[in-house]
Structure formats: C-alpha cells, structure tokens
Regions:
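Extended substrate/RNA-proximal surfaces in nucleic-acid metabolism proteins
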Residues: 1-51, 103-107
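Active-site metal-binding loops of divalent metal-dependent hydrolases
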Residues: 23, 60-61, 84-86
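Structural preference for beta-strand elements that scaffold enzyme active sites
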Residues: 18-19, 53-57, 79-81
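Short acidic/histidine-rich active-site segments
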Residues: 79-93
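A short acidic, amphipathic alpha-helical/loop segment
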Residues: 44-45, 68-73, 97
C-alpha cells in the first residue's frame, strides 16, 4: 500500500494537469480495500493531489474513491469531479454510486461537526 501511494504521488508530481480516474479501483481486484490505506496514506495522497492541482474523479462505474478518501481530498482542498466512466450513452449523466459516496461524505462531515 505504501508503494501504491508513493507511485500515485510521484505520478501526480511528474505530470502537468493530471486527472486520476477510478483511483483505487485496483484494490478490491487484489483482495484489498480503501479502508486499509489508513488516514496517513490518504492524507499524503490527497495533499499531493491538492498541491499539484490534480483533478480526482469520483467514478460511477467503480464507486471509487470511497467516502473516506473523498473526505481526505476535501480536507486537503483537492479538486473533485464526478465521472460516469460510461461505455453506454444511456448511462451518461447517471450518478447513483457517486451520489451514494457524496451522501456518505456529507453524513460523515455532519458527524464531525457534532
């Protein structure tokens, strides 16, 4: 996981105008989850995204990054956009999974304010 985050940061630092698409979608494919990244890794990743002006997509098809990673991005001041990653015209502009991720982020923020 450290290598994944380090490689992600280096890629952002080495690319002008980067945009990360369905970042962390590899994790469940190899038996891991975003939760295993931990707050420190996510904070470093999110800070790098903010510092480099990297745009991070919340991806409809893969449902990632998830709420914890999106919270880290928001806390760092990174730019976040929605993406359908659609391969079918009928799916363009439909954001059921993205909405669920953002709703979870909003709920977590409400809890933090209490």
């Amino acid at each position: 996981l450290d290598l994944l985050i380090e490689a992600s940061i280096r890629a952002m630092e080495g690319t002008r105008h980067a945009q990360l698409a369905h970042w962390f979608s590899i994790l469940p494919k190899v038996g891991l989850s975003e939760e295993q990244l931990g707050a420190g890794r996510l904070a470093a990743w999110a800070s790098a995204a903010a510092a480099t002006g990297t745009v991070v997509e919340v991806n409809e098809k893969w449902g990632c990054p998830g709420p914890v990673a999106v919270l880290a991005l928001r806390d760092a001041g990174a730019r976040i956009v929605a993406s359908t990653d659609s391969h079918d015209a009928a799916d363009v502009g439909r954001y059921d999974r993205v909405t669920a991720v953002l709703d979870a982020v909003e709920a977590a923020e409400r809890e933090e304010r209490r």
